[in-house]
């Protein structure tokens, strides 16, 4: 059992099982994700870590071949309850994918997109929120004189930070990151990692990564998944230096993949 000490839970996941077309992907997972911390999901390809991440904002609803049992609560509320507005859930629980996906429009309009959908139209208000979001994503100083250039003129690392700014602009409570730096060069990866560490004062972050060194650098808690099961979940320092289970030790030391 993980002791969060001063950190209360953001997500409470209870007995979660999920299958694609009757093929099990997650098996009876129970864990808590602490608020205002970085939690990493690690494990080999196909272990279920991205499946678990996407379950946290109901992206699996888009696939009618997925079946689910168990419960996920966000701040105490069952995210699958009938009264839950899925669009509002996905605003509260933002998602950043492996490959940067800026919209084919200007840097400014990328960040403004979600704000306009929320009914924000006044230019002064848009300007203020966009500046705040780009500052929060550590991108403002690089683009502030060129906001109306195409987002596609940015480097890959800048595009990923733009996507993070676009997500932050609508003020989520949680940011889900699925391998956010795997396609980036080392310098861009470092900037993303610094950004992740800095954002936890504002919101809760959940990170999927194949890179165990990255998990060790940026996360406060780490969950090791294998074969759709939660093998071990502990504070990151503990899991990497003194794992409780041999299976965990074998994976993090590279004896098994």
Curated annotation (Swiss-Prot):
<feature type="domain" description="ABC transporter">
    <location>
        <begin position="11"/>
        <end position="252"/>
    </location>
</feature>
<dbReference type="InterPro" id="IPR027417">
    <property type="entry name" value="P-loop_NTPase"/>
</dbReference>
<keyword id="KW-1278">Translocase</keyword>
<dbReference type="GO" id="GO:0015415">
    <property type="term" value="F:ATPase-coupled phosphate ion transmembrane transporter activity"/>
</dbReference>
<comment type="function">
    <text>Part of the ABC transporter complex PstSACB involved in phosphate import. Responsible for energy coupling to the transport system.</text>
</comment>
<keyword id="KW-0067">ATP-binding</keyword>
<keyword id="KW-0997">Cell inner membrane</keyword>
<dbReference type="InterPro" id="IPR003439">
    <property type="entry name" value="ABC_transporter-like_ATP-bd"/>
</dbReference>
<keyword id="KW-1003">Cell membrane</keyword>
<dbReference type="GO" id="GO:0035435">
    <property type="term" value="P:phosphate ion transmembrane transport"/>
</dbReference>
<feature type="binding site">
    <location>
        <begin position="43"/>
        <end position="50"/>
    </location>
    <ligand>
        <name>ATP</name>
    </ligand>
</feature>
<comment type="similarity">
    <text>Belongs to the ABC transporter superfamily. Phosphate importer (TC 3.A.1.7) family.</text>
</comment>
<keyword id="KW-0813">Transport</keyword>
<dbReference type="GO" id="GO:0005524">
    <property type="term" value="F:ATP binding"/>
</dbReference>
<dbReference type="Pfam" id="PF00005">
    <property type="entry name" value="ABC_tran"/>
</dbReference>
<keyword id="KW-0472">Membrane</keyword>
<dbReference type="InterPro" id="IPR005670">
    <property type="entry name" value="PstB-like"/>
</dbReference>
<protein>
    <recommendedName>
        <fullName>Phosphate import ATP-binding protein PstB 2</fullName>
        <ecNumber>7.3.2.1</ecNumber>
    </recommendedName>
</protein>
<dbReference type="GO" id="GO:0005886">
    <property type="term" value="C:plasma membrane"/>
</dbReference>
<dbReference type="InterPro" id="IPR003593">
    <property type="entry name" value="AAA+_ATPase"/>
</dbReference>
<keyword id="KW-0592">Phosphate transport</keyword>
<dbReference type="InterPro" id="IPR017871">
    <property type="entry name" value="ABC_transporter-like_CS"/>
</dbReference>
<comment type="subunit">
    <text>The complex is composed of two ATP-binding proteins (PstB), two transmembrane proteins (PstC and PstA) and a solute-binding protein (PstS).</text>
</comment>
<keyword id="KW-0547">Nucleotide-binding</keyword>
<dbReference type="GO" id="GO:0016887">
    <property type="term" value="F:ATP hydrolysis activity"/>
</dbReference>
